[in-house]
C-alpha cells in the first residue's frame, strides 16, 4: 500500500476480513477499492460530491450521493460491522452529531483525522500569526474544507463526553507510527501529525 496515504494503511489494518463496511465521505473510492481487494469486504460508500460518486460507480463501487450530517440518520442501528470516517470529521458541519451517528450504525467505528496540535502547526501559527499551512494542512484558511479542526486531545475529550470507548489508537508523523491500546499518550498531541481511532459504543 505504498502509494496510499498512511492513515489508509492503518485503517485497513483495523478492518476485519469480509466485514460489512460503510465508508462515509469516501471521496473517489480509494479506500473502498483497496478494502474490497485486500479484505474482501462488502463495502458501501456515502459521498456528498456527485463527481466523486460518479468516479466510484465507474470503478464498480456501491456508492451513493449523500450528506453525512443529514443522511446517516436513515441507516438502522448496527447495520454495518465497521463504519469509517477518514480525514472527514473536521470538514463536517456538526462533528459531534456525526460521530454519534457513526457509533450508532456501526459495531465498530474508525475515525482518522489531522492533528491540529502537532508541533509544526503550533510553531507555524506562533511564528507567522496566521492559520498554519503545512504538508498535511496545505490550503489557505479561505479555501479549506476543514471547518472544525481539532487536536488529538480534543477528539479524545469528545469521545469521553459521548461515552465512546477507544479500543485502539494509531498515531504517526513522517518518521514513526505508534499503536496504543485504548487512548494515546498525552505527548502524542504534540508529536503526532495524524491519528486513527478504533471506537465502539
Model-based region annotation:
Residues 30, 34-71:
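Class I SAM-dependent methyltransferase SAM/SAH-binding core
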Residues 97-101, 108-201:
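S-adenosyl-L-methionine-dependent methyltransferase catalytic module, highlighting the catalytic core
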Residues 17, 78-79, 105:
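Alpha-helix C-terminal capping/helix-to-coil transition sites in glycosyltransferase folds
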Residues 25-27:
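Class I SAM-dependent methyltransferase "Motif I" SAM/SAH-binding loop
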Residues 73-82:
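A short acidic, Gly/Pro-enriched loop at the edge of an enzyme's catalytic core
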Residues 2-18:
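Conserved alpha-helix/loop element of class I SAM-dependent methyltransferases that forms part
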Residues 82-94:
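A short SAM/SAH-binding and catalytic strip from SAM-dependent methyltransferases
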Amino acid at each position: 500500500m505504498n502509494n496510499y496515504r498512511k492513515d489508509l494503511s492503518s485503517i485497513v489494518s483495523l478492518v476485519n476480513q469480509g466485514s460489512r463496511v460503510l465508508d462515509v465521505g469516501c471521496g473517489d473510492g480509494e479506500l473502498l477499492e483497496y478494502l474490497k481487494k485486500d479484505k474482501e469486504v462488502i463495502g458501501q460508500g456515502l459521498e456528498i460530491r456527485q463527481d466523486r460518486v460518479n468516479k466510484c460507480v465507474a470503478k464498480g463501487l456501491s456508492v451513493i450521493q449523500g450528506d453525512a450530517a443529514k443522511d446517516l440518520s436513515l441507516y438502522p442501528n448496527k447495520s454495518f460491522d465497521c463504519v469509517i470516517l477518514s480525514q472527514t470529521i473536521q470538514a463536517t458541519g456538526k462533528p459531534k452529531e456525526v460521530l454519534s451517528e457513526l457509533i450508532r450504525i456501526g459495531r465498530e467505528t474508525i475515525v482518522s483525522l489531522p492533528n491540529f496540535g502537532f508541533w509544526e502547526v503550533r510553531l507555524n501559527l506562533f511564528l507567522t500569526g496566521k492559520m498554519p499551512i503545512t504538508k498535511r494542512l496545505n490550503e489557505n484558511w479561505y479555501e479549506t474544507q476543514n471547518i472544525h479542526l481539532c487536536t488529538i486531545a480534543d477528539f479524545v475529550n469528545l469521545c469521553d463526553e459521548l461515552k465512546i470507548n477507544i479500543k485502539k489508537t494509531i498515531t504517526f508523523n513522517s518518521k514513526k507510527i505508534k499503536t496504543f491500546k485504548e487512548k494515546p499518550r498525552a505527548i502524542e498531541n504534540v508529536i503526532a501529525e495524524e491519528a486513527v481511532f478504533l471506537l465502539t459504543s
